[in-house]
Structures are given as C-alpha cells and as structure tokens.
Amino acid sequence: MASIATLGSHCSLQVLKGAKDEGLKTILVCEKKREKLYRRFPFIDELIIVDKFREVLDEKVQSTLEQNDAVLIPHGTLIAQMSSDEIESIKTPIFGNKWILRWESDREMKEKLMREATLPMPKPVTNPSEIEKLSIVKRQGAAGGKGYFMAANEDDYNTKRNQLISEGVISEDETLYIQEYAAGVLAYLTFFYSPLKEELEFYGVDQRHESDIEGLGRIPAEQQMKSNKVPSFNVIGNSPLVLRESLLDEVYTMGENFVEASKRIVAPGMNGPFCIEGVYDENAQFTSFEFSARIVAGSNIYMDGSPYYNLLFNETMSMGKRIAREVKTAAETNQLDKVTT
C-alpha cells in the first residue's frame, strides 16, 4: 500500500492527518528548525530531517521515499522553494499533475491557461508605462503575497518598486506581473477533480487575510497620506466563506471549464485539488485573477469538513483525507498512474 509524504509546511498537518485517517503511513520531510513542532503530532509516522527542503531532490531522500512507496503531495512551499525543472525532476510519484505546476508558477503561462478556460480576468498590463488605472503588481510563483504592491501610474510603480528593492523584498532583476486591480469580495474557490471517477467536486470557499494591507483601515487617512511605507499583501491566515446558493452553478461551470482546458493544454490535466481565486463585484460577477494547481492553505480551515463537502459525503472529509482516499483507491485498483505523475 502507498504511503503519503509531504513537506513540513503550508498544509502538511491536514494532509498527513487525512492520510492517517485513511489508514496510510505518513512521512514528513521536515526542516531541523521545525522538528520540535511536528514531533507533537502522533499521526506523523516518520520524519525525514533535512537542513533545507531542497534536499528532497537528493538521492538519499528520494530513496527513502521510494522504499516506502510514497506519493508526494505538492503544496505552495514546494513551488516557492524549487524551480519547475527541479520539481519535474523528482522521481517520487507526485499526486496530481506536476507538469501543470509550471503553468501556475509562470504568469504568462498561467494567463494563457485561464483564457483557454474562458475564466473572466482582469486586463493585464504589459508595461508600467501603460498603467492607466489602479493596478496590482505581482511576483512570479507562490510568493504568498509578499512583495505585491498597487500602483496608480508609472511613477507610482517605479517609486514603490525601487523602495521594495532597497528593502530587499524583491530583487532588481525580478520579473513582475501587472494587472488591473479587481475590486470586490475576495473568494478563493477550491475544487477536487477525480480522474478515477471523472468527476468534479466543489470543496469550499475561503478568504485570505493579508498583512499589513488589512490594517490600513484602522489608520486615519491623514496619517496614511504621510506614510511612505509600501503596504504588504503577505498572507497570514484564512477564514471560511459560504456563497449565495444562486452562485453555485457558475462555480461548477468555471471548475469544469478549467479541468477541460487543462486536459487540452497540459496533459494529463488538472487532477486532484485546485483553486480558482478572484473577487465578486457589486453585481455578483466573478473575476478570476489567479489559480493554484494543487492543495491550497485555505483548505486548512475545513479540517472537519467543509459545508459543501458535507453535502457530498456522509462523513467528515478534509481535503487531506480526500487526497488520501483517491491515492488509496488508486493503489487498491492498480491505477496509481492515473492520479500521479
């Protein structure tokens, strides 16, 4: 029987607790500095202690994972710590589609896939000189919002970019992505596509809390205008959200379109968990500005099951447990090749 492995960060506790609930062995690749934390949790069967997560690329670590018939569950830390080439070189079977993680990390590829899926998107801005209205500037990959900033025009862009460079938040040669800012209620829509059942499941919705942009509302406008600090969009945590029921049909349609587009563009497609991220405007119209092609940290708020998964399963079902069940079913039916790459 396969075991479940992941990096000790992001959503690893949820992933491994779900795997243990499904009766699978659990393995955590853990940095030394976090060993004390993860030793607290009895559902973690084995810790592989490393100095840096990049050691998962080493033959020694991959050999240990192979001996345990491990399936590696990717999350945001894997993408943030390693290049797409490095992730694709990992010999350990990766749950889902490791090739699509490159499309998540590269902004231009990401935009292409979202357009193929006919997701409504903000207008991209190809050059700072073309900023005509409030825009948001983003880094490549899974940066967790750190180093993002807003700009009203080219001068504003250059001032804030230079300040973040001087503070060491971004590098001078870093490629930044600009898109017009979409205002509304933040909604991060999480799905699970099962290649075994060929079925899409809507898991739930969360909102992300970002510092220190969320704290600015408590500062009087006079003091805000005198401050030279560039606000940060660093994600600190998440909270649950339940949508109006009338919005759910469109939610499923967007998820299905994304799955089908992924099959056409980056085989074998969007298998496993993914998230379409955006905002609802005053007319309840959704605009999508991102996608994540793997489990997201927002799923941590539903470790006892989400409202929408409670409608599909007559048991407590976290995303970690859902992943483990897919792996377990695939292993029992000799179909692991359908759920891993």
UniProtKB/Swiss-Prot annotation:
5-amino-1-(5-phospho-beta-D-ribosyl)imidazole-4-carboxamide binds at residues 10, 77, 238. It comes from the Archaea. It holds the Pfam family DUF1297. Binds 1 Mg(2+) or Mn(2+) ion per subunit. It is an enzyme of class 6 (ligase). ATP binds at residues 132-188, 210. Residues 106-317 form the ATP-grasp domain. Catalyzes the ATP- and formate-dependent formylation of 5-aminoimidazole-4-carboxamide-1-beta-d-ribofuranosyl 5'-monophosphate (AICAR) to 5-formaminoimidazole-4-carboxamide-1-beta-d-ribofuranosyl 5'-monophosphate (FAICAR) in the absence of folates. Belongs to the phosphohexose mutase family. PANTHER family: 5-FORMAMINOIMIDAZOLE-4-CARBOXAMIDE-1-(BETA)-D-RIBOFURANOSYL 5'-MONOPHOSPHATE SYNTHETASE, 5-FORMAMINOIMIDAZOLE-4-CARBOXAMIDE-1-(BETA)-D-RIBOFURANOSYL 5'-MONOPHOSPHATE SYNTHETASE-RELATED. This is 5-formaminoimidazole-4-carboxamide-1-(beta)-D-ribofuranosyl 5'-monophosphate synthetase. It comes from Nitrosopumilus maritimus (strain SCM1). The lineage of its organism: Archaea, Nitrososphaerota, Nitrososphaeria, Nitrosopumilales, Nitrosopumilaceae. The gene is purP.
